Amino acid sequence: MKYINVAALTVGLAGAAPAKQPSAFEGLVSKTAEEVSGFEVQVLGGMTLRAPQVYNTNFIQMKRGPRAYVQSLRKYSAFGATIPPNLLQIIDEILGELGLGDLLGDGIGAGAGEVAAVPQMFDSEYLAAVQIGTPPQDVTLNFDTGSSDLWVFSSDTPATQVNGQKIYTPGQSSTSKALNGASWTITYGDGSGASGIVYTDVVTVGGVSVPNQAVEAATKVAGSFSQDAASSGLLGLAMDSINTVKPQAQKTFFSNAMAGLAMPLFTANLKQGEPGNYNFGFVDQTEFTGNINFVPVNASQGFWAFQSEGFSVGNGQAQNFPHQAIADTGTTLMLVADEMAEAYYAQVPSAQNNAQVGGFVFDCSEELPSLTANIGGYQAVIPGSIIKFAPADTDSFDTAKTCFGGIQGNTGLPFAIYGDIFLKAAFTVFDGGNMRIGFAAKSGQ
């Protein structure tokens, strides 16, 4: 049974709550999950917001598996992730077939609410509507719990690098102010990235506005970003410590909004092949079943990192395999230690790590086993249907014989990346007020 306090969830709309109310989380923590100090969340008022996702209609379907793998690895190149040369060659060949050239190399040297997100084909990216400025300017951003910059295509971006994206124009906002002397740079190991200058302005998500939010306006972007016409940039939701603005790092949208939210948290309810959503300031009891199981967050490297004790494949025996993992909505795949990936695919008779394709592949006709992650005693089950990520030999599951797996090796990273493959299977609570993360089974799954 769930013990959500409905009054606490709606207090932002109804007015101030009594000085003392039961925590909205009472009864939600599993007895087997490690409890966190300062468990009770005081609900004294504030806002809530819902941010639904929207479809990226410009997504290119062709050979999505290796492309998603490269994007996942390059994001964490600073932490030791390496992109195998054969995989880069595969990407160059794909881009050549698409007539896009070598895009990987042209680098740069308070409230509660809900935002909805809709996936690209094969769920490679989730986008959500955001408004910036006064009057509000609409942009569509990728909500990313694995980074901490809010950056956008803007009127400062060279026209040759804008390819149909909605842009932010500071000069048309009465609340925009230049943050003099501030700059930002995001660079990946393959040389791609973006950089620019910084403004402060009103940012609105799901009807909740944050004034004086740092908005990083791109003055240079790599071609790999420019080709995605539906995405205007990123809204980072990791820790402030890894924001790239110099000389002084800036706070994320969530950090600035947190004090005004009914609860100092947000949730991610990502789905397979249909719109999901992010909720800020409240927990929607209709989106999960059973208990929410919390474990502490290790924020030392700026991420929503937590301990996973092990895993099991299908109905097989549980394996003791302790490792740090990062919950990252901005990474498509689930990247784990090579031993863990190999142990999973060892239970898939047709699976092979195919250098010509760029990762683990298998016969599309094969029914994949589930993968269960043991997190603080909670068993998070990822169905095999989600792990069957994309066709590898054609552009459609209807005609494909070989499929690309959603679980791949992390090429030496000191932690695993629990990206969208994992998050589509687990309702996730990012509790910034208590520095913990919670997981629960999704409703209807």
Q: Locations of the language-model features?
A:
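Aspartyl protease active-site motif detector
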Residues: 126-172, 203, 230, 234-238, ...
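Glycine-rich flap/beta-hairpin and adjacent strands of clan AA aspartyl proteases
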Residues: 211-289, 388-444
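Solvent-exposed loop/turn segments at secondary-structure junctions
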Residues: 145-150, 156-159, 193, 220-223, ...
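Signature of the N-terminal lobe/flap region of pepsin-like aspartyl proteases
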Residues: 105-115, 120-213, 217-219, 368, ...
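Flexible, small-/acidic-enriched active-site or ligand-binding loops
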Residues: 277-322
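Aspartic protease catalytic domain
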Residues: 17-52, 59-62, 70, 77, ...
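Short strand-coil-strand connectors
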Residues: 130-137, 204-211, 262-264, 314-319, ...
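Disordered propeptide/prodomain
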Residues: 2-139, 295
